[in-house]
Design a protein with these regions (language model features):
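A solvent-exposed, acidic/Ser-Thr-rich amphipathic alpha-helical stretch
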Residues: 34-98
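Short, surface-exposed beta-strand-loop junctions and turns on beta-sheet-rich folds
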Residues: 55, 100-102, 132-133
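Short beta-strand edge/turn micro-motifs at domain boundaries
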Residues: 93, 111-145
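A structural preference for long, well-packed, hydrophobic secondary-structure segments
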Residues: 15, 24-28, 94-99, 104-109
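Acidic/histidine-enriched, glycine/proline-rich intrinsically disordered or flexible terminal extensions
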Residues: 137-165
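A structural signal for the main folded, soluble domain(s) of proteins
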Residues: 18, 68, 87-93, 100, ...
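Short, low-complexity N-terminal intrinsically disordered segments enriched in polar/charged residues
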Residues: 1-35, 39, 43
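Hydrophobic/aromatic beta-strand elements that line small-molecule binding cavities or substrate pockets
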Residues: 80-85, 100, 111-118
Length: 165
């Protein structure tokens, strides 16, 4: 939150709009509705996931459709947990922990690191998303996915990030 002790109504509305984008992405993905999923991204957005990078909605759709699909009769449900949203003017950054449940139970979990920009009409869209996978079950229904190496600290702006970040 900003230095203010009480957020404004507009800031609260912005936070809720951003959270709704994150949740919508997962709900649509669980139903396989890729054409609608990509609408949460700005036209020139970047998605970094499963060791690949896609730029623009068309490439993002291709990446999402190319991911290992669940076998027939499998169920997948993405759940958002702890979440932070920091807003600065017309830009925002969110970190959202996620867990994915399938027919085996907990299948994998990680964090979304999202950058948002308010569009000219006032709507928020994702301009960059990094999907960082922290763990995947040995019996996952998905093909093996690249898991983030939490043992190596990441360096950003000259300061090492905490290994557990």
């Amino acid at each position: 939150m900003s230095e203010k002790t009480t957020p404004s109504i507009n800031e609260l509305l912005d936070r809720e709009a951003i959270r709704n984008l994150i949740i919508s992405f997962n709900a649509l993905g669980d139903r396989g509705r890729v054409a609608e999923m990509i609408q949460v991204f700005a036209p020139d957005a970047t998605l970094k996931a499963v060791g690949q990078t896609a730029v623009g909605r068309a490439d993002i759709a291709t990446l999402l459709q190319a991911n290992p699909l669940l076998p027939d009769h499998q169920v997948t449900r993405h759940h958002i947990g702890t979440q932070t949203v920091e807003i600065s003017g017309d830009e925002a950054v969110a970190r959202s922990y996620f867990s994915v449940l399938t027919n085996i139970g907990l299948d994998h979990h990680g964090v979304y690191i999202d950058h948002f920009r308010r569009q000219p009409g006032g709507a928020w869209l994702i301009v960059e998303r990094e999907v960082r996978l922290d763990w995947q079950a040995a019996n996952s229904v998905y093909a093996p996915l690249p898991v983030h190496d939490r043992a190596r600290p990441q360096v950003s702006a000259g300061f090492p990030k905490m290994p557990n970040a």
